[in-house]
A protein has these predicted regions:
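N-terminal Rossmann-like FAD-binding beta1-loop-alpha1 element of flavoenzymes
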Residues: 1-27
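A generic, residue-level signal for flexible/boundary positions that often mark functional hotspots
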Residues: 3, 27, 39, 80, ...
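Hydrophobic alpha-helical segments and their boundary regions
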Residues: 4, 30-32, 79, 104
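Short glycine/serine/threonine-biased micro-segments
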Residues: 4-9, 32, 40-44, 88
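Glycine-rich FAD pyrophosphate-binding loop
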Residues: 19-41
Length: 124
């Protein structure tokens, strides 16, 4: 028996894959499945926005995870018979003041230096 602590998107996904591989799985969570961080993130996958200085080694994993999402949702939809809606419309970071603008411009330059596909827009 394999025990998984946490019934968010990661714990449930790992449990699903292990069960599909014939393993016996039990998943524990202090609350309802999918109601903590997975619920709060609203299913957002924003590897371009989420990458931070000092986490450069994590970026390939973020990008690979994002690239697998379409295949993952198709398999989950097939196995669960529950329709899954997915949209890839990009992510918008908004500056509400000049300090925000400086932070976004700095982040933009950093993320472009990593080779991420980003565009800096102005409100004009």
């Amino acid at each position: 028996m394999i025990s998984i602590i946490g019934a968010g998107i990661c714990g449930l996904s790992i449990g699903w894959y292990l069960a599909k591989a014939g393993k016996k799985v039990q998943i524990f969570d202090q609350g309802k499945a999918g109601q903590k961080a997975s619920w709060a993130s609203a299913g957002m996958l924003a590897s371009n926005i989420e990458s931070e200085p000092g986490e450069e080694k994590l970026l390939p994993l973020l990008l690979e995870s994002r690239s697998l999402w379409g295949e993952f949702t198709k398999a989950l939809e097939k196995d669960s018979s529950i329709p899954i809606s997915i949209s890839a419309n990009g992510t918008l970071a908004v500056a509400l003041n000049s300090d925000d603008k400086k932070i976004i411009e700095h982040a933009f330059e950093y993320k472009k230096s990593l080779g991420l596909d980003l565009e800096l827009l102005s409100g004009k």
